[in-house]
Amino acid sequence: MYTKILLATDGSENARRAANEAAGLARELSSHVTLVYIIQHPPSQSRMVKANFDVHSLLEEDAKSEIKHTIDIFETEGLAYTLKVAIGDPAAEIIGIAEKEKADLIVIGSRGFGTLKGVFLGSVSQKVTYHAKCPVMIVK
C-alpha cells in the first residue's frame, strides 16, 4: 500500500510525533522513508567559505544536527530511510520531492519550528495537503 513514505520534519515536537507515526507505518508495511528537511535560507557566506563551498555537505550536517532524534528512531529500529535536504519554500519543496521520489504518502506535523518557524495547519501543512498528488497524514 504505502511503500514510499515521505516524512517532512524540522525537529519540533510535532515533527517527532510524525516521525514516530511514519516509523510505525514503515515497520508494519516494510516501507522506505524519505526524511525531508527544508532550510528556508541558505548558509551564510562565511560558513560556506569554511566548508570550502561544499554547500550540500554543510546543509546535510545542519539537517542531521536538527533532526538527530528522528534519525535515531529510524537507525535504532533498522528502518530503511534516505535523507533529503533542500533550500526554499517548505511546502513547494516537500511537494516537489514527493513527486520526484514518487511518494505514496506524505507524513507531516501540524506545526513546527526551526527552519519551518511558524508552521501552522493553515500554512505549510495545508498547502502540502492541497497540492500533493498523494495522500497526506497530518500528525498533531
Sequence positions of predicted segments:
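Small/aliphatic-rich secondary-structure junction motif
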Residues: 3-51, 73, 77
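Gly/Ser-rich helix-loop-strand patches that form or flank binding pockets
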Residues: 96-140
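Short glycine/serine/threonine/alanine-rich loop segments
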Residues: 31-32, 79, 103, 134
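Conserved beta-strand positions in the Rossmann-like core of class I SAM-dependent methyltransferases
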Residues: 34, 82, 137
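Structural beta-alpha unit
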Residues: 72-106
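Histidine-centered beta-alpha loop that forms part of the nucleotide-sugar donor binding/catalytic region
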Residues: 10, 88, 110-113
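A short acidic, glycine-rich active-site loop
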Residues: 52-65
